[in-house]
């Protein structure tokens, strides 16, 4: 099975845009028992790509992409487990062609498209320049390293220049195919600038794209790519890339991760082997005494999750996370579920950013898993405004 998976990943690296997904199918998976959930998640190591993790606990129907080589085997496994299934997408290649038209933003930055990295940088520079003479707000575009392909790793720092406030960090684009997280982060920039009360008690660090190389690759080559583009492994030129959110130094390479460079869950050669994870680590080291809240924006389907992910237990801040998370869910309209990360989907995940930061002293850390994957252009603003309402209520709770 591993050999087949390696071959398929090699093929993915050489085909034209979208063509590598010909014959791939996406299944809706409806789980009824905890045993089904436990066993189903173990299939990820065999090349099944979960677009949305199923949750028996919350009645969340999962979406799993299956290559043609795995289809019979996968369906046999589902039958063995008694999992209800239906074909959601018959051919991923055709699906991507049909949905591509609304992916790219036009010449203006209006939250009605998904923008390329260079345009995002230009937009951030424009905002920085617009406020360079302001006396009541300080906006800095800070570069802190470069990717393997030479792109700058940047963040926005927004604050009141006369104060030394606590810090909120918003991180997006750690999984490069989760495009909706990027406008969600940039929307936070706009909201904080417009609503200055959020600068009374906080400096805001906003990273719109943690993984620029992977993000660009999803635009130009493989839409469903999940890693960066590093070639440090022994198969780097054949199977490049590391899953950034498996590369942090907490329970590294143990759960929901892989030692195979050709896996979409590959955790790297060692913790912090990648410039993107070192970038976040350096931010933590710089602001560690001031970080009040850390939020990782992801896109696996309508959850707010808090530590731990690496073990089936809560952190010492369980009660505080639950109370604040409940307020966030309510502010977002009640459409999101709230739980400990490892319990929400019945599986653990090693090497994640929020677990690492919690282990190293950050009191409040959440994943906001934005609802819906392929949000159409006309719906982007509605979706990201809902995310902002959750972030805003969390920040306001500390200002009271």
What are these regions (language model features)?
Residues 2, 13-400:
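M14 metallocarboxypeptidase catalytic domain recognition
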Residues 1-8:
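Classical eukaryotic N-terminal signal peptides for Sec-dependent ER targeting/secretion
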């Amino acid at each position: 099975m591993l050999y087949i998976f390696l071959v398929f990943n090699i093929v993915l690296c050489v085909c034209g845009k979208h063509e590598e997904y010909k014959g791939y199918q996406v299944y809706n998976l409806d789980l009824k028992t905890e045993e089904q959930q436990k066993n189903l998640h173990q299939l990820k190591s065999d090349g099944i790509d979960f677009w949305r993790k199923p949750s028996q606990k919350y009645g969340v129907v999962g979406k799993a992409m299956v290559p043609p080589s795995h289809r019979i085997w996968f369906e046999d496994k589902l039958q063995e487990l008694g999992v209800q299934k239906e074909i959601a997408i018959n051919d991923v290649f055709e699906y991507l062609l049909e949905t591509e038209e609304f992916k790219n933003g036009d010449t203006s930055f209006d939250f009605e498209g998904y923008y390329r990295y260079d345009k995002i940088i230009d937009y951030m520079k424009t905002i920085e320049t617009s406020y360079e003479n302001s006396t009541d707000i300080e906006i800095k575009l800070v570069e802190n390293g470069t990717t393997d392909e030479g792109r700058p790793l940047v963040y926005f720092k927004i604050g009141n220049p006369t104060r030394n406030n606590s810090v909120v960090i918003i991180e997006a684009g750690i999984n490069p195919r989760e495009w909706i997280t990027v406008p969600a982060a940039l929307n936070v920039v706009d909201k904080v600038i417009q609503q200055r009360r959020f600068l009374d008690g906080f400096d805001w660090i906003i990273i719109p794209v943690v993984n620029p190389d992977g993000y660009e690759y999803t635009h130009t080559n493989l839409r469903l790519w999940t890693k960066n583009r590093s070639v440090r492994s022994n198969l780097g030129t054949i199977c490049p890339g590391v899953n950034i959110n498996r590369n942090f130094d907490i329970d590294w390479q143990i759960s929901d991760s892989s030692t195979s460079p050709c896996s979409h869950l590959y955790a790297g050669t060692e913790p912090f082997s990648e410039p993107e994870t070192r970038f976040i680590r350096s931010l933590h080291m710089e602001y560690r005494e001031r970080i009040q809240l850390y939020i990782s924006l992801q896109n696996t389907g309508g959850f707010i999750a808090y530590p731990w992910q690496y073990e089936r237990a809560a952190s010492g801040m369980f009660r505080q996370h639950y109370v604040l998370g409940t307020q966030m869910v309510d502010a977002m309209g009640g459409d999101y579920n709230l739980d400990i990360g490892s319990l929400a989907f019945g599986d653990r995940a090693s090497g994640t950013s929020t677990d690492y930061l919690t282990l190293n002293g950050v009191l409040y850390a959440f994943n906001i898993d934005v609802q819906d994957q392929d949000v159409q252009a006309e719906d982007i603003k509605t979706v990201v405004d809902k995310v902002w309402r959750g972030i805003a209520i969390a920040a306001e709770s500390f200002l009271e």
